[in-house]
From Swiss-Prot:
Listed GO MF terms: G protein-coupled acetylcholine receptor activity; G protein-coupled receptor activity
Membrane spanning stretches: 43-64, 79-99, 117-138, 159-181, 204-226, 413-433, 448-467
PANTHER family: 5-HYDROXYTRYPTAMINE RECEPTOR, MUSCARINIC ACETYLCHOLINE RECEPTOR M4
Primary subcellular site in the record, as a coarse category: membrane
A GO cellular-component term linked to this record: plasma membrane
Name used for this protein in its record: Muscarinic acetylcholine receptor M4
Biological source species: Gallus gallus (Chicken)
InterPro entries the UniProt entry points to: GPCR_Rhodpsn, GPCR_Rhodpsn_7TM, Musac_Ach_M4_rcpt, Musac_Ach_rcpt
Family of this protein: Belongs to the G-protein coupled receptor 1 family. Muscarinic acetylcholine receptor subfamily. CHRM4 sub-subfamily.
């Protein structure tokens, strides 16, 4: 948390001289920070800070509009980013410009009431930003470490409650103390032309707030991201693509064979074997007939009995699919084979290896002695295989989309955490130094470090665009006024 109590000129107050009067820390004298900038420097400062404020406002408005108009961006994680963009927008509109006025003028020209309101707004918004980052980090951590239980509770309503809690808690922590401390202690000790938090005038107290508001959250977020990264790498290793040689050796195929019909004169029927390979959701027919008795014609299937399919995808090559007669309500966990059904059982195995998915289906023939009604044809199993192939293809596509989405989220989180740490660390290091040496940090360095905290709000929208192609395309559509397909841009 950046802190206005540690302004660079405050450390020099004991030695300032105005009108041949040596001043100490006396509350009855109005002390104002010296203005050491030349006119050219003031113009440069105003231009740079004004440009940063404009870019911050435009960038965060783009983020908010993108999430609003593009359905692809309306996810729980992006709602957290929406909250963060709101905080950054407030900083761009108010905090940046008021602090620029303070720097250029060399003193606070707007009075005590505006000063306290600015400080309260600045601290509440900054604390809300940190808490939003913590929420994003914890949310991603639970998504990775508890993928089976946490997503069920990860609803839009829950996200809204967490965001509201972050803002309300930030307001309770800072606003009352900043606005009413002078009434609690009975007097205002902040000089008329200065603006800082009265109860943080002690450098040791300032450092304590920096520990609680910056260093501790940074440690927590870093630890969480390390766990997120390790869990993601573990997933990659688990689904690492095999070599070509291994894939050839482990090729899964789909075999189905109709049972041999037993008739009255014990003459065997022709057994037909159809081999179909299912790779990446595509079926390739390779029929081959093996005739056991010549002169016999293949038996056609005439029954129109329908069946329902219950499928559970697994790895480790474990068959988990069965076909049950229509109308049966057995649980897939306890399947039951109907002896009068045309098909006794279908086994399906889907093996996911990195970006390649291989599906194998096996139709187990009916038991010996089954009636003529239980024979299988060539065409019906092939149609079923294609249906399963379509399901497998759809599942692979969904997995790839989910993996790409997770990669975007993780990359975005890393970018905004890195930007937060890089921009907020210099100032908070100076706060640490100022605790032990009040005159060691030059005025200009203080101002630059303090402004870097604000620059974080400028960088965040760029992080979203660089790490998420959907954000980038939506930004482009909004800036170029191309609204036709903006709602579904990917």
């Amino acid at each position: 948390m950046h802190n206005l109590s540690a302004q660079p000129w405050q450390a020099k107050m004991a030695n300032l001289t105005y009108d041949n009067v040596t001043l100490s820390n006396r509350s009855e004298v109005a002390i104002q920070p010296p203005t050491n900038y030349k006119t050219v420097e003031l113009v440069f400062i105003a231009t740079v800070t004004g440009s940063l404020s404009l870019v911050t406002v435009v960038g965060n408005i783009l983020v908010m509009l993108s999430i609003k108009v593009n359905r692809q961006l309306q996810t729980v994680n992006n709602y957290f980013l929406f909250s963060l963009a709101c905080a950054d927008l407030i900083i761009g509109v108010f905090s940046m410009n008021l602090y620029t006025v303070y720097i250029i003028k060399g003193y606070w020209p707007l009075g005590a009431v505006v000063c306290d309101l600015w400080l309260a707004l600045d601290y509440v918004v900054s604390n809300a930003s940190v808490m939003n980052l913590l929420i994003i980090s914890f949310d991603r951590y639970f998504c990775v470490t508890k993928p089976l239980t946490y997503p069920a509770r990860r609803t839009t309503k829950m996200a809204g409650l967490m965001i509201a809690a972050a803002w309300i808690l930030s307001f309770i922590l800072w606003a009352p103390a900043i606005l009413f401390w002078q009434f609690i202690v009975g007097k205002r000790t902040v000089h008329e032309r200065e603006c800082y938090i009265q109860f943080l005038s002690n450098p040791a107290v300032t450092f304590g707030t920096a520990i609680a508001a910056f260093y501790l959250p940074v440690v927590i977020m870093t630890v969480l991201y390390i766990h997120i990264s390790l869990a993601s790498r573990s997933r990659v290793r688990r689904h690492k693509p095999e070599s070509r040689k291994e894939r050839k050796g482990k090729s899964l195929s789909f075999f189905k064979a109709p049972p041999v019909k037993q008739n009255n004169n014990n003459s065997p029927k022709r057994a037909v074997e159809v081999k179909e390979e299912v790779r990446n959701g595509k079926v390739d027919d390779q029929p081959s007939a093996q005739t056991e008795a010549t002169g016999q014609q293949e038996e056609k299937e005439t029954s129109n009995e329908s069946s329902t399919v219950s499928m559970t995808q697994t790895t480790k090559d474990k068959p988990t699919t069965e076909i049950l007669p229509a109308g049966q309500g057995q649980s897939p966990a306890h399947p039951r084979v109907n002896p009068t059904s045309k098909w006794s059982k279908i086994k399906i195995v889907t093996k996911q290896t990195g970006t390649e998915s291989v599906t194998a289906i096996e139709i187990v023939p009916a038991k010996a002695g089954a009636s003529d009604h239980n024979s299988l044809s060539n065409s019906r199993p092939a149609n079923v295989a294609r249906k399963f192939a379509s399901i497998a293809r759809s599942q692979v596509r969904k997995k790839r989309q989910m993996a790409a989405r997770e990669k975007k989220v993780t990359r975005t989180i890393f970018a905004i955490l890195l930007a937060f740490i890089l921009t907020w660390t210099p100032y908070n290091v100076m706060v640490l130094i100022n605790t032990f040496c009040e005159t060691c940090v030059p005025e200009t360095v203080w101002s630059i470090g303090y402004w870097l905290c604000y620059v974080n709000s400028t960088i965040n929208p760029a992080c979203y665009a660089l790490c998420n192609a959907t954000f980038k395309k939506t930004f482009k559509h909004l800036l170029m006024c191309q609204y036709r397909n903006i709602g579904t841009a990917r």
